[in-house]
């Protein structure tokens, strides 16, 4: 099995894994446990830029050069660096982790398990490859493959996956007790975390996390009494017996298909596409400035298409802004794929099957959601906005209508940055029905001063939409009354069945002084640990 006894337990003594953030998440926690503030990121401090994107917030952090890769940032390729030969001869072989259907004549279709020789890996997210099964050559998405016999090729290995996202995936409907995954440790370089779905009478379904440490000799262990040469051997050992874990490992967590950041290798750099390459199939929504459709690109790739009414915005300004939007890449932001920049403007993005969060809460599955799910959705939005905050960008129109929902209650932010470009007179005057007064911070509504802190105000309003299942903010008040009353210090009361601790967070978002409002980094940390802040992050095994 690869398990060896520790020769010097003192030399590899287990350290205390407990810290202030939590790992054991589930439906059994009571509402309203507040995290201890000192354990969270700076409440209202500003972030530092991490990519060369124009600074809309007057931050002074130095931008990192465009070639630098940051976690969750510009580059999304799983495998980086030069492909090396083994033993000086041959090439490293890669294996497909998923099925893929070619989208263009340049792509290569393949099936899970197929092996490849990589011809050229200089195109970033798309590699030129030769299939050893069919002999065919073409471009393949690099995040669909991994080196043969590597841990990246294992079904249970999820790489850079955060604790909260691991819990989200493991707690998805249909996963039995013992469903597991291994991911990179967020806190310890070179270490890993084992996350397991568990169940008991008190907590119901929940997730436990165990730290996998690395020996100086290269082996791995959870407890010093059971050490392994490889992660594969560790998994095999705990598949056969619990050996101090909450339960034995039963089945790897299902991996969803990875998101592609481009439609194809050609649209990676040339992403203005012909209108005739798009087919509008089903209208999903109709707004003041256009429509949203489910459609296809090239007849084979499902996408969402936002069509804008002529005159809504300048094509030149839109294209300039889209250049920036295309560089924003985060798993909680709807990915921009391509545009048709001649009027009527088309914006092509990834498709989210459950529609807008507003409709989902009012008329869809969201009506039955309980507070833990709602807080988790808020945490996802805060996570996407924390990325926008780090990139020194601004949304300007953050509300539930501009959040999209996918499978497993995944939430992604849409329409970031577009509000700045709208040329409608009634909208630009920040008056009348077209402008979202009830979501807008007073300094932005009255004086046009939009910053990331005005987005924080809007996020506080979005929180009320979540806990009230899509109720319009400030019920019974019109826009003029809202402006007047908010300027006089009025703030919405705590909604029915909303914990006072969550309402207090809303009130912090609505501070009159914008600089006193929390950062999105803080909001994300607070909400992710809302029910779990008093628990240890990692579980010790029984008698370990």
Curated annotation (Swiss-Prot):
One term under GO cellular component: plasma membrane
Annotated positions of the Phosphotyrosine modification: 427, 538
Coiled-coil residue spans: none
Pfam short name (any one): SH2
A molecular function GO annotation: metal ion binding
Domain SH2, chain residue ranges per copy: 156-253
Compartments in which it is found: Cytoplasm
Annotated keywords: ATP-binding, Cytoplasm, Developmental protein, Kinase, Lipoprotein, Manganese, Metal-binding, Myristate, Nucleotide-binding, Palmitate, Phosphoprotein, Proto-oncogene, SH2 domain, SH3 domain, Transferase, Tyrosine-protein kinase
Summary of activators and inhibitors of this protein: Inhibited by phosphorylation of Tyr-538 by leukocyte common antigen and activated by dephosphorylation of this site.
Residue ranges annotated for the Protein kinase domain, each copy included: 278-531
Known EC number: 2.7.10.2
InterPro entries tied to this protein: Fyn/Yrk_SH2 (IPR047924), Fyn/Yrk_SH3 (IPR035750), Kinase-like_dom_sf (IPR011009), Non-receptor_tyrosine_kinases (IPR050198), Prot_kinase_dom (IPR000719), Protein_kinase_ATP_BS (IPR017441), Ser-Thr/Tyr_kinase_cat_dom (IPR001245), SH2 (IPR000980)
Catalysis: reaction(s): L-tyrosyl-[protein] + ATP = O-phospho-L-tyrosyl-[protein] + ADP + H(+)
Cofactor(s) essential for the protein: Mn(2+)
Annotated active site: 397
Amino acids binding ATP: 284-292, 306
Lipidation (S-palmitoyl cysteine): 3, 6
Lipid-bearing positions (N-myristoyl glycine): 2
Root EC class: transferase
Ranges where the SH3 domain occurs: 89-150
A biological-process GO annotation: cell surface receptor protein tyrosine kinase signaling pathway
PANTHER family linked to this entry: TYROSINE-PROTEIN KINASE
Family: Belongs to the protein kinase superfamily. Tyr protein kinase family. SRC subfamily.
Its biological purpose: Tyrosine-protein kinase implicated in the control of cell growth. Plays a role in the regulation of intracellular calcium levels. Required in brain development and mature brain function with important roles in the regulation of axon growth, axon guidance, and neurite extension. Role in CNTN1-mediated signaling.
UniProt name for this protein: Tyrosine-protein kinase fynb
Originating organism: Danio rerio
């Amino acid at each position: 099995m690869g398990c060896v006894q520790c020769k010097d337990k003192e030399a590899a003594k287990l350290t205390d894994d407990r810290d202030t953030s939590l790992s054991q998440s589930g439906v059994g926690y009571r509402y309203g446990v507040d995290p201890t503030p000192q354990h969270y990121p700076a409440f209202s401090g500003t972030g530092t830029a991490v990519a060369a994107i124009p600074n809309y917030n007057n931050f002074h952090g130095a931008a990192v050069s465009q070639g630098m890769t940051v976690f969750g940032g510009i580059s999304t390729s799983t495998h980086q660096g030069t492909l090396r030969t083994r033993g000086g001869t041959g090439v490293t072989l890669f294996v497909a982790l998923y099925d893929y259907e070619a989208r263009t004549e340049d792509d290569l279709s393949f099936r899970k398990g197929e092996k490849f020789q990589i011809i050229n890996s200089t195109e970033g997210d798309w590699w030129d490859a030769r299939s050893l099964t069919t002999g065919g050559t073409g471009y393949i998405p690099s995040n669909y493959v991994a080196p043969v016999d590597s841990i990246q090729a294992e079904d249970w290995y999820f790489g850079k996956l955060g604790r909260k996202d691991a819990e989200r995936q493991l707690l998805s409907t249909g996963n039995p007790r013992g469903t597991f995954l291994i991911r990179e440790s967020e806190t310890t370089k070179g270490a890993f975390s084992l996350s397991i779905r568990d169940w008991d009478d008190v907590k119901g379904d929940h997730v436990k996390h165990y730290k996998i440490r690395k020996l100086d000799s290269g082996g791995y262990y959870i407890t010093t009494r059971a050490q392994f040469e490889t992660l594969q051997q560790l998994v095999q050992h705990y598949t056969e017996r619990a050996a101090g874990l909450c339960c034995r490992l039963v089945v790897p967590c299902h991996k969803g298909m990875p998101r592609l950041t481009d439609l194809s290798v050609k649209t990676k750099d040339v992403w203005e596409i012909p209108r005739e390459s798009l087919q509008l199939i089903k209208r999903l929504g109709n707004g003041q400035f256009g429509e949203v459709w489910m459609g296809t690109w090239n007849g084979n790739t499902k996408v969402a298409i936002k069509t804008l009414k002529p005159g809504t915005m300048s094509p030149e300004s839109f294209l300039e802004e889209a250049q920036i939007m295309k560089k924003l890449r985060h798993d909680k932001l709807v990915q921009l794929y391509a545009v048709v920049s001649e009027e009527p403007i088309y914006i092509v993005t990834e498709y989210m099957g459950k529609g807008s969060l507003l409709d989902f809460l009012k008329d869809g599955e969201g009506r039955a959601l309980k507070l833990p799910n709602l807080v988790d959705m808020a945490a996802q939005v805060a996570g996407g906005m924390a990325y926008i905050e780090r990139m020194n960008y601004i949304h300007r129109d953050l509300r539930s209508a501009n959040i999209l929902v996918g499978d497993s209650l995944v939430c992604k932010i849409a329409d970031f940055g577009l509000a700045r470009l709208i040329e409608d007179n009634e909208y630009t005057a920040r008056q009348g029905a077209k402008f979202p007064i009830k979501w807008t911070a007073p300094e932005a509504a009255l004086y046009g001063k939009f910053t990331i802190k005005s987005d924080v105000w809007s996020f506080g309003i979005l929180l009320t939409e979540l806990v009230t299942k899509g109720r319009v903010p400030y019920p019974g008040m019109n826009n003029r009354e809202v402006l007047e009353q908010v300027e006089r210090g009025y703030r919405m009361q705590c909604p029915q069945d909303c914990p006072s601790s969550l309402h207090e967070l809303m009130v912090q978002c609505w501070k009159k002084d914008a600089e006193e409002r929390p950062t999105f980094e803080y909001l994300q940390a607070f909400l992710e640990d809302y029910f779990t802040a008093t628990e240890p992050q990692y579980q010790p095994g029984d008698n370990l």
